[in-house]
Amino acid sequence: MPSFISIQNIIYPSNELSLTMILLEEWSLTYVEGIDSKKYLQGQLTIDINLLLKTHHTLCAHCNFNGRVWSTMHLFHYEKGYAYIQRKSVSQIQIKEICKYSIFSKIKIRELNSICLIGFAGCNVRSFLSSLFVKIPNQSCPVIHEDNKTILWYEKPSERFLLVLPFLDFLTLKRKINQNIFLNNSKQWLLLDIEAGLPVIDKICSNKFTPQAINLHNLKAISFKKGCYYGQETIARIFFKKTNKYFLCFLVSTGSIFPKIGSFIETKVDSEWFKVGVLLSIVHVKCEEIYIQVVLRKSVNINNLFRIHGFENIFLIKN
């Protein structure tokens, strides 16, 4: 039986991406069930869960008492409760923290290790998925449930989809593919998230930033009208007093470097370099370019030259 799937080891920006299936091994799925799940999540997350339709998913954050982000996640209705997708490196500590106050609630929170997260993106991706599924999500209905499979629709940086399905169903899906498609790892999805302006919070950067510092207020991931939730006092104060001093952006350079996540970002003023930000994520693109997502001080000149502490490669802010 011929294989239509070709391994791809090069990461491409969205405007150059061929039809690609992406294994999201760096992300995880957490499931929340129980009669108190809605009420409990309402007191923990930054969005108003009462407004979340069953046909939609939403970006949000889980913060500590001081308004620092443990993790960012995409939340949606799933089976008998809710599920959210977050970075795998932070899932264990995030689940531990969100369970701390659940002893008196009828709720169960756990990571679903038996579920596969598979991305689809690139040229003609909608047409491709339409040959495999009866319904495909879109802007008006970004979440579709079909049997025991769920498909999420993402608009930016270009139309893409995330499939949530059991491993055996993934194997069945692979056997049904009858047209050429590339297979890549989660770095490809990471790049698409960076291009889309979605903050990437791994374990090393957990518990360091407020939601506003990573642009969640502009991504409609914070509700300022709901009742109390963890971190609300700090988050609301920053919003109403306009005291946020940071912003999320992505920078580009060339070369091949491997800095640690959490490294300092420096900018050049006159002849000296000063620390002005923190590295959240990095992807090597087409073997020659480097894309990084960073948190910078708002006071910085966006036309400046930047570098990662300990490396000489010069970065510029991507417009």
Curated annotation (Swiss-Prot):
This protein's UniProt keywords: Cytoplasm, Folate-binding, tRNA processing
Main location (coarse class): cytoplasm
Location relative to the cell: Cytoplasm
Keyword DNA-binding set for record: no
Cellular component GO terms, alphabetical: cytoplasm
Molecular function GO labels: folic acid binding
A Pfam family that the UniProt record links to this protein: YgfZ_barrel
Amino acids binding folate: W27, W189
SUPFAM superfamilies in the cross-refs: Aminomethyltransferase beta-barrel domain, Folate-binding domain
Signal peptide feature range: none
Family annotation (InterPro entries): GcvT/YgfZ_C, tRNA-modifying_YgfZ, YgfZ/GcvT, YgfZ/GcvT_CS, YgfZ_barrel
GO biological processes: iron-sulfur cluster assembly; RNA modification; tRNA processing
Function text: Folate-binding protein involved in regulating the level of ATP-DnaA and in the modification of some tRNAs. It is probably a key factor in regulatory networks that act via tRNA modification, such as initiation of chromosomal replication.
Family to which this protein belongs: Belongs to the tRNA-modifying YgfZ family.
HAMAP family: tRNA_modifying_YgfZ
Protein name: tRNA-modifying protein YgfZ
Originating species: Buchnera aphidicola subsp. Acyrthosiphon pisum (strain APS) (Acyrthosiphon pisum symbiotic bacterium)
